[in-house]
Amino acid sequence: MARPPAATAPPPPPPPPPPPPPPIDRLVWLACAAPLSRIPVVGTQVSYFPEGHAEQCPAPLPDPLPSAHRFFLCTITAVDLSADTTTGEPYATISLLPLRHDAPAPAPAPAPAAAELAEAESQEFRYYAKQLTQSDANNGGGFSVPRLCADHIFPALNLDDDPPVQSLTMGDLQGDSWEFRHIYRGTPRRHLLTTGWSKFVNAKQLVAGDTVVFMWCGAPAPERKLLVGVRRAARYSGESACNARGRVQPQEVMEAVRLAAEQAAFRVTYYPRHGAGEFVVPRVEVDKGLTTPWRCGMQVRAQVMEAEDTRRLAWLNGTLTNLRHQQIWRTLEVEWDASAASSSMKNRFVNPWQVQPVDFPPLPMGLKISNNNISAPVCNGDSLLVPPILMHPQPQPPADIQGARHNNGHAYADIPSSSTPSMVRTQQLFPRDLQILVPHTDIVTPQNGSPPDNPVNTPLSASDGMKTIQLFGVTITSPVQGDTNGAFASAQVNQVPEGVDDETATEEASDTSLPDSLTNGHNQDGARL
């Protein structure tokens, strides 16, 4: 008689899922995120862009996205801030609920209450971020600590010791602790992290170009709690928008698009990296960008980090060269001006809500315009502040109306750009065939103020003389009208305050400070590229 087969043992139960990463504080998350990163606000209406979500993946999507699913109007229902368990990078898990595209726009959000602002300002929090050099990232080396970081983030050293040294304990975003030896030595003396630094570099797999962020929060020194975080530099190859160090899987993007198309709730993962556009964008910003009348030739600008000093922001100017009407995500193609900041611009394709059109620059101080004359400040070199009426070259007018002003409502499409929206170059502004004809007694034209290949012609009568003055070491010759006494009569020169130069004014107008050196973490909000 055959024996019945033995019962097979049931398969072992699957291992429990790993515990979710611990939540991190909002200020810590913003400090470790790329500059200009933002945290979406629960309850607001946003546009979700799957193509931007796909840029968070290390490889392209297996299938192209349907053309009907370019973006989805949604409401944010939850935002969870965490740190990656492998890399330590901050990321946000955003829960979204799709809306109909004809849903009415929400009312403007109320201003934060005074109590909320006071509570945010009262939090004791500072951080310092430094991009790693090749020496910092070398295995077996040390970390050169900027003095500002050592003085304001680390506890004070006893400079009477020889050498001054201390042990620092720092926690990371994953809850682990790290021990570093902080010493002040060398010729000239400098602050260094030695013992413990190589272990940290190897564990975090840091390379040159990544950024380390030192933070303290809570009570003042010596009871303050020290934290350390990292920012990962993106790795792009060629024209690909995919980041080789991306952490989002393509399947997550495809699943989010499927659920959004079915009007079902879904979640997305957002890593705030430099160069990756936000793909969950406030609706009001998208609506404004899509309703702007963009056209080729427009001058635009975007706020970016300086390439040589990531603690500072700069306005990067460019010219709109192409409109890709078949899509919404990165529909604008911009040719960026050559500048120090342009090296931080990784993609010439941008979104309409990431840039601003550049209108007429403001009138400079001291410039006077009347019906039949123009008087302008003396210019330095080839940089000149000019009024809008001179922005657009006009055909030579008939002889009977020479000297009249001709306005053009679309002149700003041809404004040359430079590091600041209000500064233009006379070589570009005044072509060879441009004649500016005005009464000879009403304008001062310094010979040293106009390049020789770009003349500004001012006819002189036989009775006119020449008057020279010396300003900041430059001899300036101006036409004047003689009188019976031979005295200087009608030439008008706008005076420059003593001790002021153009370089200072240009620097103040073009740059604003980015809080990567020492900040309380409250000014990270803003669009980024």
Curated annotation (Swiss-Prot):
Listed Acidic residues bias regions: 499-510
SMART domains: B3
Gene3D superfamilies linked: 2.30.30.1040, DNA-binding pseudobarrel domain
Tissue: Expressed in roots, culms, leaves and young panicles.
Disordered: annotated segments: 1-22, 443-462, 497-529
SUPFAM superfamilies in UniProt: DNA-binding pseudobarrel domain (SSF101936)
GO biological process: auxin-activated signaling pathway; regulation of DNA-templated transcription
InterPro entries on file: ARF_dom (IPR010525), ARF_plant (IPR044835), B3_DNA-bd (IPR003340), DNA-bd_pseudobarrel_sf (IPR015300)
GO molecular function: DNA binding
Domain of life: Eukaryota
Principal location: nucleus
DNA-binding region: 128-234
Similarity comment: Belongs to the ARF family.
Subunit: Homo and heterodimers.
Name assigned to this protein: Auxin response factor 13
Organism from which the protein derives: Oryza sativa subsp. japonica (Rice)
Gene: ARF13
